[in-house]
From Swiss-Prot:
<keyword id="KW-0472">Membrane</keyword>
<keyword id="KW-0961">Cell wall biogenesis/degradation</keyword>
<feature type="transmembrane region" description="Helical">
    <location>
        <begin position="26"/>
        <end position="46"/>
    </location>
</feature>
<feature type="topological domain" description="Cytoplasmic">
    <location>
        <begin position="1"/>
        <end position="25"/>
    </location>
</feature>
<keyword id="KW-0812">Transmembrane</keyword>
<dbReference type="InterPro" id="IPR006702">
    <property type="entry name" value="CASP_dom"/>
</dbReference>
<dbReference type="InterPro" id="IPR044173">
    <property type="entry name" value="CASPL"/>
</dbReference>
<feature type="topological domain" description="Extracellular">
    <location>
        <begin position="130"/>
        <end position="160"/>
    </location>
</feature>
<comment type="subunit">
    <text>Homodimer and heterodimers.</text>
</comment>
<feature type="topological domain" description="Cytoplasmic">
    <location>
        <begin position="182"/>
        <end position="185"/>
    </location>
</feature>
<dbReference type="GO" id="GO:0005886">
    <property type="term" value="C:plasma membrane"/>
</dbReference>
<keyword id="KW-1003">Cell membrane</keyword>
<comment type="function">
    <text>Regulates membrane-cell wall junctions and localized cell wall deposition. Required for establishment of the Casparian strip membrane domain (CSD) and the subsequent formation of Casparian strips, a cell wall modification of the root endodermis that determines an apoplastic barrier between the intraorganismal apoplasm and the extraorganismal apoplasm and prevents lateral diffusion.</text>
</comment>
<feature type="transmembrane region" description="Helical">
    <location>
        <begin position="76"/>
        <end position="96"/>
    </location>
</feature>
<comment type="similarity">
    <text>Belongs to the Casparian strip membrane proteins (CASP) family.</text>
</comment>
<keyword id="KW-1133">Transmembrane helix</keyword>
<dbReference type="GO" id="GO:0007043">
    <property type="term" value="P:cell-cell junction assembly"/>
</dbReference>
């Protein structure tokens, strides 16, 4: 009986059901990834932005302070993470609309363009901060290693880099899921 239905040209509803389920799954994955990436960028910006440590030298009454805004690369890192976090929070309603309306092709294209720009900005900020963190842990000809003295400062800035690089991976996955959703239309 099924062979006759296929031969006579009748369409089967079994084939359409998995496509709808896959599109819904892609929309859910997009929404979850945006939320996780927003939390990661927020935590990275907050951790780096509140990083400060003061060291007192006992031989002289001198206090040395290490703070993120002493270095322009770390300031750029905080600004980049804040911008990307704001973008991700503002893009969540569009992601929810893709969950409700699966045919929203134009907004998906716009989100892919902005997602790509945001992953570039976040990568630039994380890369700039990575150089400073590396030089803080290891020394260079012109830099002294400061992590032996400012242990808490170095732990916090290293941790915020981990959150930022994890968010970069999440945004790349968002771009991939959006491209898959666009190719399915």
């Amino acid at each position: 009986m099924k062979a006759e239905a296929v031969e006579s040209g009748e369409a089967s509803t079994i084939i359409a059901a998995p496509k709808r389920g896959i599109n819904r799954g892609i929309s859910i994955a997009d929404l979850i990834l945006r939320g996780v990436a927003a939390i990661g960028t927020f935590a990275s910006a907050l951790t780096m932005g509140t990083t400060s440590e003061t060291l007192t030298i006992f031989t002289q009454p001198i206090m040395i302070r290490a703070k993120y805004n002493d270095l322009p690369s770390l300031t750029f890192f905080v600004i980049a993470n804040s911008i990307v976090c704001g973008y991700l929070v503002l893009s969540i309603p569009l992601s929810i609309s893709h969950f409700i309306r699966r045919e929203a092709r134009i907004t998906r294209i716009i989100l892919v363009i902005f997602d790509t720009a945001m992953v570039e900005l976040l990568t630039a900020g994380a890369s700039a901060a990575t150089v400073v963190v590396y030089l803080a842990h290891k020394r260079n000809a012109n830099w002294l290693a400061i992590c032996q003295q400012f242990n808490n400062f170095c732990e916090r800035i290293s941790g915020s880099l981990i959150g930022s690089f994890a968010s970069i991976i999440m945004i790349m996955l968002i771009i991939i899921t959006s491209a898959v959703a666009l190719s399915r239309h």
